[in-house]
Amino acid sequence: MIRTSSILKNCNYRYIHCIHRCLLNEANLKDRKTHNVERVSNEKTFEQALEEERKVFGELFEAGARVENMRHTNASKIIDKYYNGLQDNSEGTSVKKEKIVFNHSQRAQRKLPNKDHEFLKETAGNDYVYERAEPSAISTKTISEQTRTLLEKIFDEDNSINKSNRELLNLNLRKGSGMEALRQPVAHSNVKFSEEVMQEIGNKIRYQTTLDQVLEPHIDYLREAVKSDYDLLRYLKQSLDIYKKRNKDLELKMNAESSNIFEDIRSACINKPAELPKPLAMTLPYIIVKSLRLGDFDFPADRKYTLISYVYNECKNNMDASLYLTICNVDFYNLLVQLLWENFQEIRYLRRVVTEMSVNGVIGNIETVDILDKIVKEMRSLNEDVFLEAGEQLSADEEVSSSANKIVNVGVLWNKDTNNDLLIVENYLKSLKKNLTRDR
């Protein structure tokens, strides 16, 4: 017989063992729940941080785009105050059209009607006389006709030069290897350019001319202070440091409250010619490109490329995205492309630059088209000359001339990558030409 004590003992053992196992299971379940909660919390925190980062960068680029659009939209209105002579009366506002006459025989000296005309008189010099519109005055229509002639000259392909050789080259290449990368771009004959494009070009010319006038004291200071490329490098570094430490609120307030921003720049430049006047978002991009293009600084091309590379890398590596958006505009990229080609003559470097311009929304202008058009023509003419020389040698060789379908792929460092890079640059050039000719 089984004793009662033994039964109770066994029951108590099983009961205690069962309780221990339940406690372990409950503890494991709590650990898993806690781990899942922590993992979900970490994922939510990471997603929130990622979303905030995207929002910050999106706001920065949107703000830069708005500033750029506002600058282009209001540039014409701001500059017209100096070239059209806005006159305020107590009864109302009346606009009095004035024209700038160059090299006029009768230079009538008269009192200018308002402060804006006095500003132009002081900054223009002795070669400008302000009179009412006459047949000899340079009007908007004359500027438009000159701009149209310049555009047609740049866009017109010279088809008479090596036309037969170029057609023979394309025919042989397509028969032999089917290389589509060497196809010639379609000639732009009888191109009609939109009035909006020519108006933008005219506004930019007037904008650059006005900045030349108001920043003349500071440019004269640079001519005296800069004796070597090291001096210019030190000046560029100091200017970038000042921009990084600028008071953003003060500049925004200055832009909002100032009625004549060019006059403010002129006054600050006259009072302190050694300092670059504010707002730096307007003056710094101009002075960087201007200093690298001044004829007084006759530096070698490699030194100029070193200077512009320093500015370019500083803008790209800085945490402040506005530095890149402000400095690296289309004029800066045009100079960068020009110096890249003068120093290296490698199409792959140009391909990287034009790709970056497309990705970052830097739209090329007529100067970009002019620079790239010359580079593409130089690449093609150079390759054609080498190909024709090789073709003459092949025709003299009896063994090779018997094979009609054979072709030799020759050129200056001409390979598959070169063809692809040149094709990308050509496509970018075509898109720029279409953008300048289409109605917006």
UniProtKB/Swiss-Prot annotation:
Coiled coil: none
Gene Ontology biological-process annotations: mitochondrial translation; mitochondrial translational initiation; mRNA processing
GO cellular component term of the entry, any: mitochondrial matrix
Transit peptide limits: 1-15
GO molecular-function term, one example from the UniProt record: RNA binding
Entry's localization field: Mitochondrion matrix
TM helices/strands, residue ranges: none
Record keywords: Mitochondrion, mRNA processing, RNA-binding, Transit peptide
Major place of residence: mitochondrion
Functional summary from the UniProt entry: Required for the processing and/or for the stability of the CYTB and COX1 intron-containing pre-mRNAs and of the ATP6 transcript. Could be a stem-loop RNA-binding protein that plays a role in determining RNA stability.
Miscellaneous remark of the record: Present with 2060 molecules/cell in log phase SD medium.
Name under which the protein is recorded: Mitochondrial translation factor 2
Gene behind the chain: MTF2
